[in-house]
């Protein structure tokens, strides 16, 4: 993912967590906040509840790829944070992709509804 499309500063992550809306799924948590830009920015987090460093990095790679496959449908102007939950590495690829797609749809970012 290009650097200009990523959330990088802790200030941005804190702002999305503080001011944004959240949508939950057993595999991941989605936080969104308007960013008043012409493009979206994405951030992926995996805490220690996911497992050790290898498990956290694997979870982030899998979520990043699932988000990448769904992101063309996302409308512009949002900061999106996806937080991995415990069972994310045990889930199959289609289940994970469906979870991310469902979270984006629930948030109204899939292009079918304007938020």
Regions found by a protein language model. Give the residues of each.
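Positively charged, solvent-exposed patches that mediate nucleic-acid binding
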Residues: 1-115
């Amino acid at each position: 993912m290009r650097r200009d499309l990523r959330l990088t500063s802790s200030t941005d992550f804190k702002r999305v967590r503080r001011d944004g809306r959240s949508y939950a799924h057993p595999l991941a948590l989605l936080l969104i906040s308007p960013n008043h830009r012409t493009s979206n920015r994405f951030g992926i987090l995996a805490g220690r509840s996911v497992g050790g460093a290898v498990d956290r990095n694997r979870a982030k790679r899998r979520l990043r790829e699932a988000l990448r496959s769904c992101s063309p449908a996302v409308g512009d102007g949002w900061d999106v944070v996806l937080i991995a939950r415990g069972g994310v590495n045990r889930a199959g690829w289609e289940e994970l992709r469906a979870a991310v797609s469902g979270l984006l749809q629930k948030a109204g970012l899939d292009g079918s509804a304007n938020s």
